[in-house]
C-alpha cells in the first residue's frame, strides 16, 4: 500500500522537526530517554520543550504503526502463488513478528505520554501523588512498551544473520527455519510479560519480583 507507506515516511520529517524544536526552545527536554515523571512534569520542566518532544514521539509512533500494518497486510495478502506461511524466508518472518510487536506495544506508549501531556497542561494527576496519581504507573506503561521495543530492534537481526550464515557457507537453505520461527514468536510473546525487570528498584513486593525474575530467565 504505497500511499500508506508514503504517509508513514512523511510523518517522520515533522517528527524530527518537533524534536529539534524541543531542544531549541526554553531549556530543552532534559528528561533522559525514559521521560520519567516527576522530572518530565511541570515541576521540573516548566516550558514547552517536553510537550514538543511528546508530540514528536506521537508522530513517530503513528508512523511506525502505519508501517507495521503495511508489512503485516502485505505478508498476509500478497505472497506468491502457492507460498505458504511456513515457506516464507526467515527474514520476512522476523519483520512480520517485529511489526506485530510494534502494533501491540506502541499504543501503550502513546497512552502513557498522552497522560503525561494532560498532567502537564490540563491539570490531571495521573502521575502526581498530590492528586491521587502514581509516578510508578508511568514506569509500568513505559516499560510495557520499552521491553518489546528492544526485541523490535533485535528481531530483524535474527532473520538477517540466519540468511547471512546460510549464504556465506553456501548452503541451499537456512538451517532450522521452523525452529527459528517458533523461537522468534516465543520471544516476541514472552517479551510482553517481563517488563517490570526494568524497575526492580522502585519497591515491588517479593512475589512480583520473583515472577518477573523467573519469566525473564525463561526468555
Swiss-Prot record:
Record's cofactor remark: Binds 2 heme A groups non-covalently per subunit. Binds a copper B center.
Cofactor(s) required, per the database record: heme; Cu cation
InterPro entries to which the protein is assigned, alphabetical: Cyt_c_oxase-like_su1_dom, Cyt_c_oxase-like_su1_sf, Cyt_C_Oxase_1, Cyt_c_Oxase_su1_BS
Transmembrane feature ranges: 2-24, 48-77, 90-119, 135-168, 177-193, 206-219
UniProt catalytic activity: 4 Fe(II)-[cytochrome c] + O2 + 8 H(+)(in) = 4 Fe(III)-[cytochrome c] + 2 H2O + 4 H(+)(out)
The keyword Transmembrane helix belongs to this UniProt entry's keyword annotation: yes
Binding sites annotated in the UniProt record for O2: 151
Chief localisation class: mitochondrion
Keyword Transmembrane helix: yes
GO BP annotations listed: electron transport coupled proton transport; mitochondrial electron transport, cytochrome c to oxygen
Record keywords, A-Z: Copper, Electron transport, Heme, Iron, Membrane, Metal-binding, Mitochondrion, Mitochondrion inner membrane, Respiratory chain, Translocase, Transmembrane, Transmembrane helix, Transport
Pathway as given in its UniProt record: Energy metabolism; oxidative phosphorylation
Position of the 1'-histidyl-3'-tyrosine (His-Tyr) cross-link: 147-151
Broadest EC class assigned to this enzyme: translocase
Localization per Swiss-Prot or TrEMBL: Mitochondrion inner membrane
Residues reported in the UniProt entry to bind Cu cation: 147, 197-198
Mitochondrial intermembrane side: 25-47, 120-134, 194-205
UniProt-listed Enzyme Commission number(s): 7.1.1.9
Membrane topology: Multi-pass membrane protein
Record topological domains on the Mitochondrial matrix side: 1, 78-89, 169-176
GO molecular function: cytochrome-c oxidase activity; heme binding; metal ion binding
GO CC term, one of those recorded: mitochondrial inner membrane
Protein purpose: Component of the cytochrome c oxidase, the last enzyme in the mitochondrial electron transport chain which drives oxidative phosphorylation. The respiratory chain contains 3 multisubunit complexes succinate dehydrogenase (complex II, CII), ubiquinol-cytochrome c oxidoreductase (cytochrome b-c1 complex, complex III, CIII) and cytochrome c oxidase (complex IV, CIV), that cooperate to transfer electrons derived from NADH and succinate to molecular oxygen, creating an electrochemical gradient over the inner membrane that drives transmembrane transport and the ATP synthase.
Family classification: Belongs to the heme-copper respiratory oxidase family.
Quaternary structure (record): Component of the cytochrome c oxidase (complex IV, CIV), a multisubunit enzyme composed of a catalytic core of 3 subunits and several supernumerary subunits. The complex exists as a monomer or a dimer and forms supercomplexes (SCs) in the inner mitochondrial membrane with ubiquinol-cytochrome c oxidoreductase (cytochrome b-c1 complex, complex III, CIII).
Name the record gives this protein: Cytochrome c oxidase subunit 1
Lineage: Eukaryota, Metazoa, Ecdysozoa, Arthropoda, Hexapoda
This protein's encoding gene: COI
Amino acid at each position: 500500500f504505497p500511499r500508506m507507506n508514503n504517509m508513514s515516511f512523511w510523518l517522520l520529517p515533522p517528527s524530527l522537526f518537533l524534536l529539534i524544536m524541543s531542544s531549541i526552545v526554553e531549556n530543552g527536554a532534559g528528561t533522559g530517554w525514559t521521560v520519567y515523571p516527576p522530572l518530565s512534569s511541570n515541576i521540573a520542566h516548566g516550558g514547552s520543550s517536553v510537550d514538543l518532544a511528546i508530540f514528536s514521539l506521537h508522530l513517530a509512533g503513528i508512523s511506525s504503526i502505519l508501517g507495521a500494518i503495511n508489512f503485516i497486510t502485505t505478508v498476509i495478502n500478497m505472497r506468491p502463488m502457492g507460498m505458504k506461511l511456513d515457506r516464507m524466508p526467515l527474514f520476512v518472518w522476523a519483520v512480520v513478528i517485529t511489526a506485530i510487536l510494534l502494533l501491540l506495544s506502541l499504543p501503550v506508549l502513546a497512552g502513557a505520554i498522552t497522560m503525561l501531556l494532560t498532567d502537564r497542561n490540563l491539570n490531571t494527576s495521573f502521575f502526581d501523588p498530590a492528586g491521587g496519581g502514581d509516578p510508578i504507573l508511568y514506569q509500568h506503561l513505559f516499560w510495557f512498551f520499552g521491553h518489546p521495543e528492544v526485541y523490535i530492534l533485535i528481531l530483524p537481526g535474527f532473520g538477517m544473520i540466519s540468511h547471512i550464515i546460510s549464504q556465506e557457507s553456501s548452503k541451499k537453505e537456512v538451517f532450522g527455519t521452523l525452529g527459528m520461527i517458533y523461537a522468534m514468536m516465543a520471544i516476541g510473546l514472552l517479551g510482553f510479560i517481563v517488563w517490570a525487570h526494568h524497575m526492580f528498584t522502585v519497591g515491588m513486593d517479593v512475589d512480583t519480583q520473583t515472577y518477573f525474575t523467573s519469566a525473564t530467565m525463561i526468555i
